[in-house]
Amino acid sequence: MRIEQELKLGFKDVLFRPKRSTLKSRSQVNLTRDFTFKHSGRQWSGVPVIAANMDSVGSFEMAKALAEHGVMTAVHKHYTVNDWADFVKSADNATLKNVMVSTGTSDADFQKTKDIMALSDELIFICVDIANGYSEHLVEYVERVRAEFPDKVISAGNVVTGDMCEELILAGADIVKVGIGPGSVCTTRVKTGVGYPQLSAIIECGDAAHGLGGMIIGDGGCSCAGDVSKAFGGGADFVMLGGMLAGHEESGGEIIEKDGETFMKFYGMSSQSAMDKHSGGVAKYRAAEGKTVLLPFRGSVHGTISDILGGVRSTCTYVGAAKLKELTKRTTFIRVQEQENNVFGKEK
């Protein structure tokens, strides 16, 4: 047993230090990034925010809506191949280039991924997703997927430390998904005691990945636009959002009427709700590591994503970054013990 004494930080522990800026308006900030990926050699241009591959977030409807903003969607893995075929027929190329095909690591998942990727050459992103990215099986599976799809962009995770980040990139991942336990409906940290403060995870994994020419997705932990900016400032190439994009008409969640109000069900992908729906319940050897909540119905996602991107633009103006690419270079975090004045609580 050993204890690491170094302080690890989450988004709530820091604020940006403002810096002199020549920008006159948020409208001058460019949030589009141009990436060339290490293994596939593929190029992509867009706003590097991703809707999470959760049942009640990463839907086909969400993909079409967010593509209008240049934003990506990691479509959840529970759609059938026929569902994908219908989507590919109805979606334009601008949408398809901003979609990730999510998969698990079984032989059936591998065959399903092959069938989906064969539907269109415009599908270029594969998201290999398991809760514990420290499994040797994941490394072997990434190698298998890379051998089958040498020209596709592969994301794999989730991990929170530089060593495993490097191993996945060397195995063939272009992007590593970073985050264990920070999600709004994730209970892994309290159920298992395992986790890592998200900002420190992003900083450390980003440093490791960039040293090898790879990239990272900061997955989870964002509760407001300022957190999205902090993830980018800490070195995330992409930021994945679940709870912030849940509860919308495009989210695909179950709508529930209660006491005259409309709610949408939102749950973690290791929750009792998810396992009841997709796995016939929680296996005897497992424990649920997610919770189910009812969110007030929030209408269309367009207003929400515009608000998030507007917040990130505003961050850039405060620190003098004309492009999102410059944000991490312009970032100085200060440690704090408070974030906001809560005299009046949340706005109704």
Swiss-Prot record:
Coiled coil: none annotated. K(+) binds at G181, G183. SMART domains: IMPDH. InterPro entries: Aldolase_TIM (IPR013785), GMP_reductase (IPR050139), GMPR (IPR005993), IMP_DH/GMP_Rdtase_CS (IPR015875), IMP_DH_GMPRt (IPR001093). NADP(+) binds at residues 108-131, 216-239. GO terms for biological process: purine nucleotide metabolic process. It is an enzyme of class 1 (oxidoreductase). GO terms for molecular function: GMP reductase activity; metal ion binding. Belongs to the IMPDH/GMPR family. GuaC type 1 subfamily. PANTHER family: GMP REDUCTASE. NCBIfam families: GMP_reduct_1, PRK05096.1. This is GMP reductase. It comes from Vibrio parahaemolyticus serotype O3:K6 (strain RIMD 2210633).
